[in-house]
Amino acid sequence: MVCGHSKGGNLAAYAATWAETGVQRRITDIYSLDGPGFLPEVFEGDSYEQIRSRVHRILPYSSLVGMLLQNYEQYEVVESSGIGILQHDAFTWQIEDGKFVKAVDIEAKQKRMNEALNQWIFTLPEEERQLFVETLFQVIDQTGVTTLTEFSEHW
């Protein structure tokens, strides 16, 4: 099993996609916990197809990060005690009897916002996409915060 949260979820799926065939066969499941997707090119070859049925995505009901970029897998939506972007913190995800409390789906307004953001991102040339992501992380880094709670307090 390979698992990760946020960028770690993206990296788990990416590593499994490009692993050697022998390694891919040994991976039983890939879990991406509110991890972003990929650019469409990742899905074009056979590499991703070899693992697709083993990829499990778990997202909070107001997910932003996990809905970024292209995603082909179905996803499970869970309840969260967080509000907005704070739902990205997996410690806010609701658990009952050792299992995630399931939500019906991603909120409709969040889906619309995610679609608009993704449409915009996909219009950018590769260099500008990279610059956007790097700048976003630099801005967050400059705040000096280390948790989403701290981030929301200073926002």
Enumerate the language-model features and the residues they cover.
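Active-site signature of alpha/beta-hydrolase-fold catalytic machinery across serine-
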Residues: 14-18
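Gly/Ala-rich beta-loop-alpha elbow adjacent to hydrolase catalytic centers
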Residues: 3-8, 12
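Alpha/beta hydrolase fold serine-hydrolase catalytic domain that processes acyl esters and thioesters
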Residues: 1, 19-155
